[in-house]
C-alpha cells in the first residue's frame, strides 16, 4: 500500500501538464486516477486494519490544509503519504494496486512538471483527499 501511495504521488508529478488549454483535462485525469487508486488503497488498508482509520483521517486533514495553500510542496505531500502505517499490510492484492498505479503512470505519457508551479500538484492532492474519504466510507470507518 505504501508503494501504491508513493506511485500515486510519482504519477501526479510526472503527469502534470503545461499551462495550455490541455491543462484542465490533464488535471482532471490526474485527479481521477489518483482518487481511484487512493480509494482502493485506503479501502484495502482499512478493511484489513480498521484501527488505522485515525492515521488516514489525520493524513486527510493535513492534505486539506495543504490543498488550501497557495503553494503545494511535493515533499510535504510525500511525507504525509509515507507516514501512513501501510507497510505492515500482508495482502497480495497490493500487487494489483502497484500494477494499476504503474499503468496510470505510463498512460500519462510522462510529461514533465514544474515543481515550482503553485498549482501543479493540486489535482493530485485533491484526488488523495477524495480517495481517502471514499475509501474510509467504503470501509465503514467514516460517516458522510
Summary of predicted features, one role per range:
Residues 13, 17-144:
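Cationic, hydrophobic amphipathic alpha-helical membrane-interacting segments
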Residues 4-14:
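Sec-dependent N-terminal signal peptides
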